[in-house]
Amino acid sequence: MASQIRHNYHEDCEPINKQINLEFYASYVYMSMGHYFDRDDISLPGASKFFKDSSDEEREHGQKLMKYQNKRGARIVLQAIAAPSLQEWGNLHDALQAALDLENEVNQSLLDLDATASKINDPHLTNMLEGEFLEEQVESIEKIGNLITRLKRAGTSGLGEFLFDKELKQRFLPSLTSHPN
């Protein structure tokens, strides 16, 4: 059955379904990282919370794109979500570097989609991508890059990593730090 509301939504914009998949994949990767750092033998609660929050954010992005597809009268075509390439994330520096690489991949995919929307003259899609995704993506890349720099200064393992995680915990888990056991 054809959509009654689809208007000026070119079929070349259907790759938005691939972006939905990429956002859910990113959520899946961050969820894996969050639970990895929550393990009893790793125990970095600040990192765990940071990555779990990142997972929630990426899932929300996927859902926002799904709502947009429906709003424009397009069809949502969900694809299988690939498993993360790693199950063991190493130290926090390694995980943050993987997160930065992932954010850059998501950003490039959004830029490609934005270029397609501009090429086929779809101002609605261009406006949505530029207003709701691209700026936030640049901020995420900057945030993770800054975290990597600060972690390198503190030391990427041992006491430096522990102290850095303590700072993350204070930023992302204020209720745990305000009531010491």
UniProtKB/Swiss-Prot annotation:
Enzyme Commission number(s) of this protein: 1.16.3.1
Reactions that this protein is recorded to catalyse: 4 Fe(2+) + O2 + 4 H(+) = 4 Fe(3+) + 2 H2O
Residues binding Fe cation 2: 58, 103, 137
Post-translational modification as stated in the protein's UniProt record: The N-terminus is blocked.
UniProt keywords, alphabetically: Cytoplasm, Iron, Iron storage, Metal-binding, Oxidoreductase
Chain positions recorded as Fe cation 1 binding sites: 23, 58, 61
Gene Ontology terms: cellular component: cytoplasm
One term of GO molecular function: ferrous iron binding
Localization (cell): Cytoplasm
Ferritin-like diiron domain location: 6-155
Annotated SUPFAM superfamilies: Ferritin-like (SSF47240)
GO biological process: intracellular iron ion homeostasis; iron ion transport
Remaining remarks: There are 2 types of crayfish ferritin subunit: a 19 kDa chain and a 20 kDa chain.
Quaternary assembly: Oligomer of 12 or 24 subunits. The functional molecule is roughly spherical and contains a central cavity into which the polymeric mineral iron core is deposited.
Family: Belongs to the ferritin family.
Stated role: Stores iron in a soluble, non-toxic, readily available form. Important for iron homeostasis. Has ferroxidase activity. Iron is taken up in the ferrous form and deposited as ferric hydroxides after oxidation.
Listed name of the protein: Ferritin
Source species of the chain: Pacifastacus leniusculus
